[in-house]
């Protein structure tokens, strides 16, 4: 810092000033200013003792400004910024002036829904439907045109339903199903260079779940199986094309990125007596990409007057089919023991195991160039850890005060909690989706905390 300040304090650049010193290094702030307004309204109506209806509307509008500003000139008098196209030879700026980028976006959203709940001794039913519309705009103040680019409104809808049937006082079976559309975020509709995606697809979720609950005074069990199809996940990839008149970073819009998530979940609680509770939770998932994907690169074409006359499109393909979804263990189980030896005292031990933890990766890394890379991503080693918890509620009449103590990773295990496949920055050797190609993040070593909670 001292060297930078010394340089900036004695740096006359006659191209800009013969008396003031030019800063070559500065401190800057990133700006994110938001103004949001909205209206939410709901109406509840009881048809009878069994049926409840609810409808509502949600309207919101937001304006977001993104920019950077000069925070500290570090000894100099001014700084020269070259990001604004309106100043080809550079713009002289001082404290508080905008640099690097300056754009504004707007988001206009409106939606409505209708839902109903039916309850009876044997049967509970739930259903809802909703629609929404969202519109984006983007304005880059650092372009000569300073044009407001507005995308067409995007409409979505969703339908959900569920049923619970109580076979008897101990056993109930349930089913849930839903279809949800999610509009792509602004970055996947209008990119930072002003390119608007052509007919962006809504992300689609189709979820089905079937299960049962069983409960007695000493035993509780919940079992469920699920299947979720996630269609048309919206992704983008930045590329250095070197095409066009600028050769700047451009964008590939990926379409048809589909995933299938299915699995089984079991929760069990056993209470032999009032002093002991035993818990077992098990989850097995099979989460994979379903099918390959296509990518579309779009670049604006200009005439001699620098006017946009069309869009050039290039197609790409990505090898995704059958690859595991990363960044989340797909198998896990928890064994728990809870003791309540005296009134107010609670002791608990939780032994947690995680397996089939595939490294995080991005679909854009599987672009097909020649032979498709369909090798499975790296699977990090499974791991287990023990957490201990204790709490004691003080027997003080009229006060709700508890003492708490926690010991996490009590056995001080060393384990890989997260990983990145074929890391760009920390991998070694050929990229073959192996351990030496991965970037790993170790879990937190043993640590503890204690505290006091007071409820009023």
List the model feature ranges, each with a label.
Residues 1-20, 67-98, 193-199, 237-253, ...:
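Surface-exposed loop/turn segments flanking beta-strands in extracellular/periplasmic regions
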Residues 23-54, 97-119, 124, 152, ...:
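Outer-membrane beta-barrel transmembrane strands
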Residues 24-26, 30, 52-168, 190, ...:
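Signature of Gram-negative outer-membrane beta-barrel scaffolds
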Residues 49, 119-122, 227-229, 252-364, ...:
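Gram-negative outer-membrane beta-barrel transporters
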Residues 50-53, 122-127, 170-173, 218-221, ...:
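Repeated loop/turn-to-beta-strand initiation elements of outer-membrane beta-barrel proteins
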Residues 59-65, 120-122, 131-137, 177-183, ...:
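Transmembrane beta-strands of outer-membrane beta-barrel pores
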Residues 133-140, 151, 164-209, 220, ...:
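Surface-exposed extracellular loop regions of Gram-negative outer-membrane beta-barrel proteins
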Residues 344, 353-367, 392-456:
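C-terminal beta-signal and adjacent terminal beta-strands/loops
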């Amino acid at each position: 810092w001292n060297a930078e300040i010394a340089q900036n304090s004695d740096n006359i650049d006659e191209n800009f000033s013969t008396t003031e010193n030019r800063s070559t290094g500065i401190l800057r702030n990133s700006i994110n200013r938001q103004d949001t307004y909205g209206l939410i309204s709901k109406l509840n109506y009881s048809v009878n003792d069994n049926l409840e209806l609810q409808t509502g509307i949600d309207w919101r509008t937001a304006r977001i400004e993104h920019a950077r500003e000069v925070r500290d000139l570090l000894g100099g008098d001014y700084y020269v910024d070259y990001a604004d196209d309106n100043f080809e030879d550079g713009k002289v700026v001082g404290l508080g002036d905008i640099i690097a980028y300056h754009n504004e976006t707007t988001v206009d959203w409106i939606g409505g829904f209708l839902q109903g709940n039916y309850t009876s001794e044997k049967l509970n039913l739930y259903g809802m439907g909703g629609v929404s519309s969202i519109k984006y705009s983007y304005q880059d103040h650092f372009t000569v045109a300073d044009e407001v680019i507005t995308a067409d409104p995007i409409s979505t809808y969703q339908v959900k339903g569920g049923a619970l049937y109580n076979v008897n006082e101990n056993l109930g079976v349930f089913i849930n199903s839903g279809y949800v559309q999610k509009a792509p975020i602004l970055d996947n509709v209008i990119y930072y260079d002003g390119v608007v995606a052509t007919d962006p697809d809504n992300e689609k979720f189709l979820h089905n779940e079937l299960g049962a609950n069983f409960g007695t005074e000493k035993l509780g069990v919940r079992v469920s199986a699920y299947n979720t199809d996630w269609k048309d996940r919206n992704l983008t990839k930045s590329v250095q094309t070197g095409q066009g008149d600028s050769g700047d970073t451009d964008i590939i819009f990926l379409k048809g990125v589909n995933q299938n998530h299915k699995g089984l979940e079991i929760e069990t609680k056993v209470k032999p007596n009032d002093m002991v509770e035993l818990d077992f939770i098990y989850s097995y998932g099979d989460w994979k990409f379903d099918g390959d994907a296509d990518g579309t690169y779009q670049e604006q074409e200009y005439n001699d007057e620098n006017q946009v006359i069309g869009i050039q499109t290039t197609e790409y393909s990505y090898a995704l089919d059958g690859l595991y979804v990363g960044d989340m263990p797909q198998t896990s189980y928890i064994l728990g023991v809870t003791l309540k030896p005296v009134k107010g005292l609670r002791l608990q031990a939780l032994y947690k195991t995680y397996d089939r933890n595939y490294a995080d990766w991005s679909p854009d890394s599987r672009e097909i160039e020649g032979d498709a890379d369909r090798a499975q991503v790296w699977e990090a080693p499974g791991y287990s850890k023990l957490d201990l918890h204790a709490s004691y509620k003080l027997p003080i009449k009229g006060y709700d005060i508890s003492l708490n103590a926690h010991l996490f990773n009590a056995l001080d295990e060393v384990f890989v909690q997260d990983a990145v496949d074929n890391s760009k920055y920390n991998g070694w050797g050929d990229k073959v989706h192996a351990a030496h190609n991965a970037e790993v993040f170790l879990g937190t070593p043993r640590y503890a905390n204690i505290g006091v909670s007071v409820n009023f």
